[in-house]
Each structure stands twice: as structure tokens, then as C-alpha cells.
Amino acid sequence: RLIERGVIEKYGDKNGCFRLIDSEAQNIDWFNSSINNIDIKYPFGIEHYVHTMPKNIIVVAGSPNAGKTAFMLNIVAMNMDKFKINYFSSEMAAMELRSRLQKFDFPISKWRFTAKERSHSFADVIKPEEINIIDFMELTEDFWKVGGMIRSVYDKLSTGIAIIALQKAHGATMARGGVGSLEKP
């Protein structure tokens, strides 16, 4: 009877497996919306070529040792006086992070951001209204799941953004996860 009323539907190939039908969708009030770019700065003046909007996901893909962390730390340096920034590192502890920050042309005491060690479940720690930098989103198996992982981060954002570093194999044109890594950005 629940199937006939449109409450559930058969799910998968196994007998007796069903799922609740979610018929709700949030309205997009495009008519009353204003266009507010986030005035974020990027290395190489990238902001002159792209407009960053609330809830945007920016993916930075590169092979190992290509400079992804340096790129991410430069974003922090260029924006920390204007925005609250959360930096989630999956590969650096305090000593290495401090060593990298000391290479910049200003005193270590001038750095203003929150650094956290994190290598999984990033959507659980995202700050919805702030800049969230994930350096990097590790994919050790099931690379095809990256699209869902990025989607989970997107769903947590409200007016903030996420900048996500992904590994790429040497010579590859896309990050691990292939086209799935391009679906949300």
C-alpha cells in the first residue's frame, strides 16, 4: 500500500528492499537574490578570471609535490585579514606547518587562521559561513566516491566556500576520482 500511495519504492535488486521517496525540494529564490561575489584573492590573480560565489567548491588538483600545499597556504596568506579561514590538513602536523609558514615574508605572529589535522569526513567539520581549505582530500580506494565526498561538503556550506586539494597521478589530466571530481565544482 505504501508503494501505491507513493511513500516508498523498490530499491536495488534484492527482494524486500525499499526506500522512502523524498518529494521535498527547496525553492531557489533567484528573483530576490542579489549577486554577491566573494572578494577572495588567489595566487596568480586567478580572481580576475573567475567569480567565487557563496557555496562554491574550488578544486585544486596536482600530482604529488606539485605545489598544492604552497598554493593553499598562499590563499590563506592573501585572505586571512578579511575572512575566517579553516585549514584542514591531512598530511602536516604542527612542526611541519610552522616550518612552511616561516618561509613567507612576514612574521609567524601575523598568521590568522585556524589549522586542524583532519584526513576524513570533512563535511562533519566544515564551517558553513567561512572559507574552508581541505589540504588534501585523501582517496586511498574507491576513487569514484570523490563526487559524493565533495557533495557532502557542498551540502554543509551556506555562505562560505570550500577549496579542496586532490591528488592527481603524474601525467593525468584529472584528479583521482576522474570526472567525479569535476561534478560539483
Regions of interest found by a model, annotated:
Residues 3-13:
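A short, conserved structural fragment
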Residues 39-44, 113-117, 171-172:
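Short gly/ser/thr-rich secondary-structure transition/capping motifs
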Residues 51, 63, 79-160:
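Conserved inter-motif catalytic segment of the P-loop NTP-binding fold
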Residues 67-72, 141-148, 173-174:
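Active-site-adjacent loop/helix micro-motif of nuclease/hydrolase catalytic cores
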Residues 147-185:
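Phosphate-binding/switch region of NTP-binding enzymes
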